[in-house]
Amino acid sequence: NHIVLDPVMISKGGHHLLQNEAIAALKKDMVPLATMITPNIPEAEVLTGMTIRTDEEMQEACRKIHALGAKTVLLKGGHLAGAPNDLYFDGTEFTFYKGDRIETKNTHGTGCTLSSVIAANMAKGHTLTEAVEIGKMYITKAIQHSFNLGHGHGPVHHFYAFDESLKEGHISG
């Protein structure tokens, strides 16, 4: 049994979505149940009380979040300047997942999608690191194939693989 916890605590606009009591309950009651927690930088700053701007600060934040009881931590670095590198910590070793910044405003739901893909692949029997690697590949493609809907942050394209299969003739339409 695995639990992937995406602590959705802060909106794209920077507004806190949880009151202090809920954050305390999340840290005390939910994080210790997590096989993996997947905070972004602003969420990790709330969980740790620290400012995160460097790779070293990302590592320290992972240590602090791991100390709250999560088995593993995947700290998503997309909110930092430069390349959107994510950091995985299993309690012993750190692994950076390097990425290239994709110029798009269509990033709504990226964190939820990544954690869901990781959870689904863990349920399929993949190891934690395999699930993270599959999740990273999936979310990168979903962002690359995103499309504009409405105003502001648009969604990623969750069904990009289906569209690619149709174009390649693997699925008859």
List where the protein language model places each region.
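Glycine/small-residue-rich loop that forms an oxyanion/phosphate-binding "nest" at active or ligand-binding sites
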Residues: N1-D29
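Short beta-strands and strand-loop turn motifs
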Residues: V4-K12, T38-L47, S115
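Glycine-rich beta-alpha junction loops
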Residues: M9-S11, G77-A81, R101-E103, K136-I139
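Conserved phosphate/ATP/ADP-binding segment of small-molecule kinases
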Residues: N20-E93
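Short, small-residue alpha-helix embedded
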Residues: V46, T104-L128
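Short, charged, surface-exposed loops that flank catalytic or proteolytic processing sites
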Residues: T51-M58, A123-E133
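Short pre-catalytic strand/loop immediately N-terminal to key active-site residues, enriched for Gly-Thr
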Residues: F94-H108
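Charged C-terminal helix
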Residues: T129-G173
